[in-house]
Regions:
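Short, solvent-exposed secondary-structure boundary motifs
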Residues: 1, 157-162
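Bacterial N-terminal signal peptides that target proteins for export
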Residues: 2-13
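C-terminal motif of bacterial Sec signal peptides marking the signal peptidase cleavage site
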Residues: 19-23
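N-terminal secretory/targeting leader peptides
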Residues: 25-144, 163-360
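A gly/proline- and charged-residue-enriched helix-loop-helix capping module
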Residues: 144-159
Length: 360
């Protein structure tokens, strides 16, 4: 079967199947609303309509809501590709986990059941042990450090490590920085001892909490508020947007800026789909993906700024971790680094040194 006809046939089948399955969609992950968006949200219908028969109709899986920055980034990507190809390549975005959660969409990508998806690095690490190095706690000095790593040689090397598994990362999306928040002021490692802190059910995060001297309590996202309110947890950790969206500031009003984890997200194309494309079309896809990442990061920054302003106005107390204390937190992570990246400590050192100021 001609590869163009195959892509169109598969696209038509998927469009019909997903329309029927929409009512069975899984709930979106963590944050459910967005601020700082343009007045008109992008949708599949926002794209210019060209009077042509498309060569390709591709599917794009997104587990967040329509107004979430990563979803809007996906729509922007689809628009850009549509415009660059004059309607020859069309991409349909399915938000709200219509096509499954991140774990299942990655599997579908690997075998060509889906064409594109946006997934968190924390989910992707199952397919590249090396990629654990990008999400180690207290690894990055700041956001600029992380972007320098992701968009440089290290980021390209780690992206390439996924290709043999059937995944081709295209660009990196922002997901903010995670901080702790508590029912009482906490500003030192000593004050962390014995606390119970809610974390996602991710082994690395549970290990991080234990190494800081606290107890990890894996609780579903929607139950964090009640767990803190009932005294089952002394606090939790997340970014400003999640903290605001779920009103956790009402029960844990002390927000500690420790910046323990930055976990980027990636826009991915299936290797099966990638192999269908010409060299010229691959270049268009890469360029449009990079532009959509810039757009998503702009939306994310606006969202976080507004979330922070809102919770501060409500009476939240922001606590800054001193450099001496942050070093203590960072030093406590050495066993975790060796556990998850023992074979890649040279890479970890390269990440640490990226963009580092020259010693005086």
């Amino acid at each position: 079967m001609n590869k163009h006809i195959f892509a169109l046939f598969r696209g038509a089948v998927l469009l019909l199947g997903f329309a029927l399955l929409t009512g069975c969609a899984q709930a979106p992950a963590e944050v459910s609303s967005v601020s700082g968006q343009p007045s008109a949200l992008l949708t599949n219908e926002s794209a210019i309509v060209y009077n042509v028969t498309p060569e390709y109709v591709f599917t794009y899986a997104e587990n967040q809501t329509e107004d979430y920055p990563t979803t809007q980034g996906a729509y922007r990507f689809a628009q850009l590709v549509n415009k660059r190809t004059q309607g020859r390549i069309q991409i349909r975005v399915y938000a709200n986990a219509q096509l499954g959660d991140e774990t299942s969409t990655l599997e579908q990508l690997r075998f060509g059941g889906l064409d594109f998806a946006r997934c968190s690095l924390s989910t992707m690490t199952a397919y590249s042990e090396m990629s654990n190095a990008l999400m180690l706690p207290y690894l990055y000095r700041d956001a600029d450090h992380m972007w320098a790593v992701l968009e440089g040689e290290i980021g390209r090397k780690i992206s390439d490590s996924f290709i043999e598994t059937g995944l081709v990362p295209l660009s990196w999306y922002d997901a903010g920085v995670r901080n702790f928040y508590f029912t009482k002021p906490v500003s030192t490692l000593d004050e962390m001892q014995g606390l119970v802190i809610r974390v996602q059910p991710v082994e690395m995060m549970e290990d991080m909490i234990r190494l800081l001297g606290a107890s990890a309590l894996p609780v579903s996202y929607e139950n964090v508020y009640s767990a803190i309110q009932r005294g089952e947890a002394d606090g939790a950790e997340n970014n400003w947007s999640s903290y605001d969206a779920m009103h956790h500031n009402e029960v844990a009003p002390y927000y500690l800026l420790d910046e323990h984890m930055r976990v980027p997200e990636s826009q991915i194309i299936s290797a099966v789909t990638w192999d269908l494309l010409s060299v010229e079309d691959r270049q268009i896809i890469k360029e449009c993906s990079a532009l959509s990442a810039d757009y998503e990061r702009m939306l994310w920054s606006a969202r976080e700024d507004e979330a922070r302003a809102r919770v501060m106005e409500s009476g939240c107390t922001e606590i800054t971790l001193s450099e001496d204390e942050k070093k203590k937190f960072r030093d406590a992570m050495e066993p975790l680094y060796k556990k998850y990246c023992g074979d890649y400590m040279d890479l970890v050192d390269q990440i640490r040194q990226t963009g580092a100021p020259d010693p005086q």
